Amino acid sequence: MRGLLPFLFLLSFFLSPIQAQPEGREEELEETWSEDRDQAPPRVVEESEVVGAENEAGLAAGRSYPWIILKKCRERGGQCHSGVCSWNEKFIGFCSFARPCCRKRRAVP
């Protein structure tokens, strides 16, 4: 009997009509939608323009983006891995969260 009471309460809660918005609010949303449709379509932007603008803004703000970090890792002679570096590799830095930059260890003469 104890298990039945919470079940009935939840059942009545989910079956009761719930009004999230007043009726007048729906009409306002429909009007806004029709106004948005009348606007001109957005301009198609080249991907290179976006990447260039983001890169310039990021460098000005001092942020590093994944492709910049990957390039730095490769310049150091490393490669980005998932998880951890293997036993025969040396940790150089991080490419991103839980992605270390590793390079092969040099053989000791």
UniProtKB/Swiss-Prot annotation:
Q: List the disulfide bonds.
A: 73-101, 80-95, 85-102
Primary role: Has antimicrobial activity.
- What is the protein named? Defensin-B5
Keyword Glycosyltransferase belongs to the record? no
Q: In which tissues is it expressed?
A: Highly expressed in kidney, and expressed at lower levels in testis.
Q: Where is the stretch described as Disordered? A: 21-44
Q: Which organism is it from?
A: Ornithorhynchus anatinus
Q: Which InterPro entries match?
A: Defensin_beta-like (IPR001855)
Major location (coarse): secreted
Q: Name one Pfam family in it.
A: Defensin_beta
Query: Which terms under GO biological process does the entry name?
Result: defense response to bacterium
Gene Ontology terms, cellular component aspect? extracellular region
